[in-house]
Amino acid sequence: MRPLIACALALSLFGSQNLSARPALRDYILTGAKPDHLFVIDAAARKVTSDIRVPDANGIVGLVVPSPDGKRAYVLVNRMESISGIDLDTGKQVFRANLSSGDEVVHSFFSVNITPDGRELIVHELPTKRGLNEYHVQEPRFAIFKTDAGLDAKPVRVFPAPRRVHLVLPKADGKSFYALGFQLFEYDLATGKKLGERGIRNWGRPGYSTPDMLAFWPVTEPLDVFVTPVYSTLGTGKDAIAKTSLMKLDLKSGALSYQDFEDTSAVIFSAVASPRNGEVFTVYTQLSKIDTNKGVLVDRVNLPHTFYTINIASDGHEVFVGGTMCDVAFYDPDTLKQRANLKLPGCPDQSISTLRVIRR
Amino acid sequence: MSLSSIDRLRRWRRAMLGCVMLLGAAGWLAAPAMADAPPAADQQTVRTWCAGCHTEDTPGQFQRLSAVRKSPEGWQMTIFRMQHVHNLALPDDARDAIVKFLSDTQGLAPSESAAGRFALERRPNMPDLKLGDDLPDMCGRCHSLARVSLQRRDADTWLRLVHMHVGQFPSLEYQASARDRYWWDIATKQLPAKLGAMFPFDTQAWRGWMNRPHADLGGEWLVHGHSPGKGDFVGTLSVKATGGDNYTAHYSLQSPEGKPIGEIDSLVRVYTGYEWRGSSKVGSVDTHEVLALSEDGRRLTGRWFEAAHTEVGGDVVAERAEGPAAVFMVSPRALKIGTTSEVLIAGRGLNGTVTFGNGTSVKVLKASPTLIRASVKVNDKAAPGPRAVTVGRTSAADMAAVYDKVDRLDVQPAYGIARVGGGHIDPVTAQFEAFGFIESQAGQAPVALGPMNVSWKVEPYNADAVKAQDVKFAGRIQPDGSFVPGPGGPNPERVFGTNNAGDLTVVAGLDQEGKELRGQAHLIVTVQRWNTPPIY
């Protein structure tokens, strides 16, 4: 029964806009859930328009990467060993890259992204050779896949990569991409040549400790800006103060900046930059609003439960929180009051999945 | 926000990310009972089941497999991985036989397993081994360093183990206390040599031990012990060999007051000539004993515990029944000045006048060569301090202690962890005990009075615990000092609907002439562990 409904929903998705003469673009939210769900939510209607079952997901739909035209979503499944590309109109799998092959098991730690032209996927791979009686961990690498490669995609280019990369972010000009790990690395997309490396471990902020960051939700919409919390201590010994800062990477200009806004007083998992007034919203068990023009925490409210991920309407008029459990909640960016809460059908666990916004 | 609350936030965040990252980790089955079928194994059994992957390079030398030595539980865990990760279809009897054979031929000498025994004995809330600055974070944050210390291998084989870790758990390098350093570089370039020097494959100790004939444990033994929260016990143990290092054992136990505790039958297999693993039932509860035979073959020491609640158990000592006269235990140990108390003396070959030293008078109520019940009166003039107890010509120092006032209560464990239950996982309780001490003059050690009868309560550990009402939600402490955590899962009554975690101070109170002496410990109530491997 369930797959039939899913298909029906999938077919009707986006149907309405074709009927109108001048289709107004709408925001759709994408999120994954255990064991194989990819949900499409009409944000304004507060409605799940599609519950797509990803083939051979094997446990969890973690990372979600929409294509720039919003027609497809690439999801990391099969315990980080496979990438499945789903056509959001039909709900069908149109792309599949099983990263492991032969005696080599390959994982990607959430480090998958798509180029701005939608033609290539950039994947940071962690390969291990499995011998008869031993494992041999190999050096990591970047693998580039063509998005039109179909259901047995193989990389078209492979380059050496640093260890412990947790996020890949393409630069807006499509010529290079960033990899976030020990440092912020930049690589030429065509040749794999390392173009630069900026400090994260040694971020060059006098008096501050080495920062701690673990960001694996590559949310950069709607501004082509990536923001994430960074934790450190300022000073040493008895006078040490725990600091939460925002790291901001502008994918258009390549500018990297850090901004303090509070002595650590809350756990924050993820953040999103609003198109309005330099505001940034962050989430975990609280929803916070930060004014990055002034570098201050403007407001903070308790949430009914923990949410790992956050995103925002394209025009900034609404904040979305999701991940962790089986609901997505909608918040007023001015008052931080909840406007709506949408329970996903069947209440499947979103866990660490990514909340993404597409415009269709 | 206070630093401690920031620590608390960090801990949560770290715990959260920990769970998030370990999604790919293989679960553990409960440890199988290891003593029900007498196995016989030789190299051929290993060849049959293991050589398909572990190529036999020279006769009896199997790749990888022949380059490590471990405890029986270490072998059990490795073979579990062969079955569940590498899809080895291995019948239980062959598995048990191979664990036995490899523990005997590639095991650990008693001196090599000594430091990490507490992990084999499943002792709860033990401080981990101190093995230098980098190992606690590098290797001791997911499991104990005791697990590491219970293996012997050379540098190249330690390196292969690092490859297994990262290959099997690719999120390892991304977790807290790994991502803050060049984990892979340290683990592959620095640690193998260090571990190889600390815990090498080839040792004098093992060469000496492996060729010694195994002692026959058959015969009669005298048992004494102590179970925290329950008290002391004494009794006898009869052991019969059934072949192939397997035994049947019968314990007959009683409390110091003479109340029967149980007639307990245990199936025992002895590994490596000294590792006693028993499986028994006390009433309807499945229990195990993990004991070690002393090198002279005359004494077994270790711990019994409940199979399903390994945190519940106690210390066990068994001495050969044959042997020179000796006093093993006096219960209770502490005797208050100006009072008369009944005590039990447990020993071997006990015969003659009983004395507890100056200022005491002893009346024997009942006597046998192994148990003497006596009434001991301590005069008002008696001097506080440790006492030797003498029976006839046998004397044992520091078996009892005379006191007027308890100066200090030391609550153990000083730092305890209890876990809420959830799903099919039972809560993990935490047992506390309060040990009394008399502070002595400068330069002298305090006098230990042993476990005291105290009242128990819990208080919030800090301001955050007050605010979160941890005392209300996290659980209850029982009159015997056992903390039973609250139910698992999110609690809608709590802020953020958080689970019943808590940060508590455990307080022991002893009333002394209207004045309360306090002792305290720190208790963290946290979420369940999803798997409990045989060696934590």
Residue positions per predicted region:
Chain B
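The canonical Cys-X-X-Cys-His
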Residues: 47-58, 98, 135-147
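Edge beta-strand at a domain terminus
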Residues: 204, 211, 216, 288, ...
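Central antiparallel beta-sheet cores of small beta-barrel/beta-sandwich binding domains
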Residues: 143, 208-211, 215-296, 301-304, ...
